[in-house]
């Protein structure tokens, strides 16, 4: 009887949660369940588990302090907190409190599959007043990561390659997180974000007042998220692939009727996909993402051009770097089938010519007006195309001369002439001497096959 009484009292104790355990293991539901199971089996150990939970919470709090201290050390912490509470934090503030601070929501979407910086399902949130874009843990309700809206520099909406069902990856690239421009010393960069949405309607998307959106109005999840982002972005807009810029020569692998906008490539041993967009070249979707914005590209060239593949070399320079800061990024094993499309894209945007790099940077900052720059860029592009054709013809002429030099025997000038047409020997004989023979060789070298045609006509 007494044993049954103990069990009933234990069950009664566990019918309500223990606050210390809830706080300590909020982010680890499986571990929290094991703790409660252990308490159920040995209820006399409840005080012990509470002490362990409190100690765990203190450790978590201790480890959460260092990231915020360097930012606020020299900048009046009290004033900083007041700014955060008013929603007016400065754009260059790097404290996690910017995105974690409590703020009214304008939009949220549950069960969003994130790939970067964490691979898990989270709730996507956009705070009101162009505040921040962030991801919240659906179990612990804690903000995992985020970025202030005014720190976002590029937003891409790209079709996920090689999927049987249409999906889209949203890629958020904050300032100093494009893989090209490093943050200034002492300044922290927000992490890039990548999440995936399906082509169908949003199943769990809500407005700021809690009303469900996107479920019955015919708007897809991709279109809904894109619209919300465009309404809140201050420095850019969502960029999608445009077939006027580039489309792959090969269709989607699993959806043959659809055009593909990606190209497979390798950076070192890491495989990824290249997208040639209206604002730059993107390589993803694995860490670290790289976005080659037009204003950072010095020039683009080809190397290791083989029968089936070729490499793309992109020379880039950071915004705050001098001429000596230029670095090259090689993207290899690109299929030859896409060479023509990539080459047309590069020439259309003037990326093959390093002399146009300053014009691209000027356009980024809107120096001298956009229209004048576009006209200048168009003229420069035409000149660049003509120059490339001239260089091509020059290379062909040099190759032809090299082949003729291989046939030339320096041992005897007179005998070397005999290696040509025998009819020419019969007509000309040896009367004109060595100087005339050398003159004939020069004519043949310059005119090639045309010299042979002239000789035959004379016969």
From Swiss-Prot:
Transmembrane regions listed in the UniProt entry: none
Sequence segments annotated as region (Disordered): 67-99, 373-459
Localization annotation: Nucleus; Chromosome
Domain of life of the source: Eukaryota
Alphabetically ordered keywords of this record: Chaperone, Chromosome, DNA-binding, Nucleus, Transcription, Transcription regulation
A GO CC term assigned to this protein in UniProt: chromosome
Compositional bias ranges of the Polar residues kind: 85-97
Pfam families in the record: Rttp106-like_middle
Role this protein plays: Histones H3 and H4 chaperone involved in the nucleosome formation and heterochromatin silencing. Required for the deposition of H3K56ac-carrying H3-H4 complex onto newly-replicated DNA. Plays a role in the transcriptional regulation of the cell-cycle dependent histone genes by creating a repressive structure at the core histone gene promoter.
Protein's recorded name: Histone chaperone rtt106
Annotated source species: Aspergillus fumigatus (strain ATCC MYA-4609 / CBS 101355 / FGSC A1100 / Af293) (Neosartorya fumigata)
Organism lineage: Eukaryota, Fungi, Dikarya, Ascomycota, Pezizomycotina
Gene designation per UniProt: rtt106
